[in-house]
């Protein structure tokens, strides 16, 4: 049986009160519509068609080649939205999954179970349902005495008895594809909203003698639709818990999983420990046996094995095996910390390579530089890389020693085994084995204290 997917993503989302198209709001680092399409892709459909509206260009840019697109000119309801997919799917044999783009919590497993149930029962239509603790706002599933689905009643159209029902429509359906598009021809907008409801297809099919069923999924939380910022936060919290639990099942320890925010695409190796109040975002990869302490923030970076990150920020950078950083240090984009290197406290590294076993202990800025191996960078060293117009590069060779308080003014080359005396301002290249001293000589003036204004305070 061929499988198809229609994703409804044309809604404006006015309740979000945002310039951003609703389905493009992110949950754990991925847009809602990406979550939906990725979950649907797991059922291996022949085609995914996304229905877009006013934000079509933005949605198409995000999904790219994951989907085909059809345009709904006016938002006239879910039935009208699905009908726009007829140009792509109308003549296909198979089963079609219909899902909204603002439900990021659905899983591939749930979609697979729905397809399986739909096929085994030989249904023309199957609605995915759930038992809601508070069903207000949801469409209710109305069944006959034998438990067969009669229809779905929307909140604004239901009578008091119907609104007592707690089994709700999740907004996900599986249809016989050809029967779906044939039934859509008979849907009208005779309802409180004046819209064409996709749910009316169920009653049309049933009245035609077709089998209409419902598969009740066990986890109601998957069905959460995001219509405002409150629901967005709720979805993020649920997704965060799901992501963290998956990492824990794979051998990662979380000291306080409720306060560790990990994006959906992050990869973490086993025996790594994540403390509370940690943020790891984007396409970050973290190896095995690492320790990430509270207050750390890692974005789009690659962390090797046995790395310790202590209350530091790492952005679009790489730390190789057996390195450490922090506390309170910052790797800005394009920093590379090679094996065994040490980045101490209050160090900023930007667009620089720190060689193997090199130590940058504290209170240092390293920008636009290449440092070799086994170098010691003293406290308070500044790599001065900017003249107000252009940025320049500094090279420091293997086994060099940079004394505390030094400033290296680029462009400059410090050779292997060179020695920079403390508090020097270096403006010229330093050759191999040489020591550079560039500071004013100390002058002691005997008995000068008594000439200072301070001495008068002693009288």
Curated annotation (Swiss-Prot):
Name its pathway.
Answer: Nucleotide-sugar biosynthesis; UDP-N-acetyl-alpha-D-glucosamine biosynthesis; N-acetyl-alpha-D-glucosamine 1-phosphate from alpha-D-glucosamine 6-phosphate (route II): step 2/2; Nucleotide-sugar biosynthesis; UDP-N-acetyl-alpha-D-glucosamine biosynthesis; UDP-N-acetyl-alpha-D-glucosamine from N-acetyl-alpha-D-glucosamine 1-phosphate: step 1/1; Bacterial outer membrane biogenesis; LPS lipid A biosynthesis
Q: Give me the reactions it catalyses.
A: alpha-D-glucosamine 1-phosphate + acetyl-CoA = N-acetyl-alpha-D-glucosamine 1-phosphate + CoA + H(+); N-acetyl-alpha-D-glucosamine 1-phosphate + UTP + H(+) = UDP-N-acetyl-alpha-D-glucosamine + diphosphate
Which enzyme type, at the first EC level? transferase
By sequence similarity, the record places it as follows: In the N-terminal section; belongs to the N-acetylglucosamine-1-phosphate uridyltransferase family. In the C-terminal section; belongs to the transferase hexapeptide repeat family.
One molecular function GO term is:
glucosamine-1-phosphate N-acetyltransferase activity
This enzyme's EC code(s): 2.7.7.23, 2.3.1.157
| Chain sites annotated for binding UDP-N-acetyl-alpha-D-glucosamine | 8-11, 22, 72, 77-78, 139, 154, 169, 227, 332, 350, 365, 376
| Location(s) in or outside the cell | Cytoplasm
Q: Which GO terms describe its cellular component?
A: cytoplasm; membrane
- The primary location reported for this protein is cytoplasm
Q: Which residues bind acetyl-CoA?
A: 385-386, 422, 439
| Annotated stretches, region: Pyrophosphorylase | 1-229
UniProt superkingdom: Bacteria
User: Does Cell wall biogenesis/degradation show up as a keyword for this record?
Assistant: yes
Region Linker, as annotated, extends over: 230-250
- What keywords are annotated for this sequence in UniProt? Acyltransferase, Cell shape, Cell wall biogenesis/degradation, Cytoplasm, Magnesium, Metal-binding, Multifunctional enzyme, Nucleotidyltransferase, Peptidoglycan synthesis, Repeat, Transferase
Q: Where along the chain is Mg(2+) bound?
A: 102, 227
Q: Spell out the Pfam families in the cross-references.
A: Hexapep, NTP_transferase
The answer to keyword Metal-binding applying to this record is yes
Q: How does it assemble?
A: Homotrimer.
Q: Can you name this protein?
A: Bifunctional protein GlmU
- Which residues constitute the catalytic centre? 362 (proton acceptor)
Q: Which organism is it from?
A: Lactobacillus acidophilus (strain ATCC 700396 / NCK56 / N2 / NCFM)
Q: Which PROSITE patterns match?
A: HEXAPEP_TRANSFERASES
- Residue ranges of the region described as N-acetyltransferase: 251-459
Record function comment: Catalyzes the last two sequential reactions in the de novo biosynthetic pathway for UDP-N-acetylglucosamine (UDP-GlcNAc). The C-terminal domain catalyzes the transfer of acetyl group from acetyl coenzyme A to glucosamine-1-phosphate (GlcN-1-P) to produce N-acetylglucosamine-1-phosphate (GlcNAc-1-P), which is converted into UDP-GlcNAc by the transfer of uridine 5-monophosphate (from uridine 5-triphosphate), a reaction catalyzed by the N-terminal domain.
Obligatory cofactor(s)? Mg(2+)
């Amino acid at each position: 049986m061929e499988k198809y997917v229609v994703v409804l993503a044309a809604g404006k989302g006015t309740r979000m009160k945002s310039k951003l198209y609703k389905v493009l709001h992110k949950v754990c680092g991925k847009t809602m519509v990406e979550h939906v399409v990725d979950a649907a892709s797991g059922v291996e459909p022949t085609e995914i068609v996304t229905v877009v509206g006013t934000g079509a260009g933005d949605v198409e840019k995000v999904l790219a080649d994951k989907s085909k697109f059809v345009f709904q000119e006016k938002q006239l309801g879910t039935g009208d939205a699905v009908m726009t997919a007829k140009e792509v799917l109308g003549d296909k044999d198979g089963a079609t999954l219909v899902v909204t783009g603002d439900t990021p919590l659905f899983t591939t497993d749930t979609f697979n179970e729905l397809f399986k149930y739909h096929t085994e029962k030989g249904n023309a239509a199957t609605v995915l349902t759930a038992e809601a603790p508070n069903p207000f706002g949801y469409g209710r599933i109305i069944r006959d005495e034998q438990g067969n689905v009669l229809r779905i009643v929307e909140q604004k159209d239901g009578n008091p008895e119907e609104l007592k029902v707690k089994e709700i429509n999740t907004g996900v359906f599986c249809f016989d594809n050809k029967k779906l598009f044939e039934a859509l021809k008979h849907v009208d907008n005779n309802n409180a909203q004046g819209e064409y409801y996709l749910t009316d297809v169920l009653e049309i099919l049933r009245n035609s003698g077709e089998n209409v069923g419902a598969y009740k999924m066990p986890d109601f939380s998957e069905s959460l639709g995001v219509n405002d910022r409150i629901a967005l936060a709720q979805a993020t919290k649920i997704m965060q818990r799901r992501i963290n639990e998956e990492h824990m099942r794979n051998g990662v320890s979380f000291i306080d999983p409720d306060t560790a925010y990990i994006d959906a695409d992050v990869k973490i190796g086993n025996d790594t420990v994540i403390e509370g109040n940690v943020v790891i975002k984007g396409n970050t990869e973290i190896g095995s046996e690492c320790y990430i302490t509270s207050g750390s923030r890692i974005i789009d970076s690659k962390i090797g094995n046995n790395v310790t990150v202590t209350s530091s920020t790492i952005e679009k950078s790489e730390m190789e095996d057996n390195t450490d950083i922090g506390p309170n240090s910052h790797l800005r984009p394009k920093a590379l910390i090679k094996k065994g290197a040490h980045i101490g406290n209050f160090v900023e590294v930007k667009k620089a390579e720190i060689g193997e076993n090199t130590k940058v202990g504290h209170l240092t800025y390293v920008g636009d530089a290449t440092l070799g191996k086994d170098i010691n960078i003293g406290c308070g060293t500044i790599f001065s890389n900017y003249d107000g117009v252009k940025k320049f590069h500094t090279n420091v060779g293997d086994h060099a020693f940079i004394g505390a308080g030094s400033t290296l003014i680029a462009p400059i080359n410090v050779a292997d085994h060179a020695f920079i005396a403390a508090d020097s301002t270096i403006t010229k290249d330093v050759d191999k084995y040489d020591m550079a001293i560039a500071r004013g000589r100390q002058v002691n003036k005997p008995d000068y204290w008594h000439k200072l204004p301070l001495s008068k305070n002693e009288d």
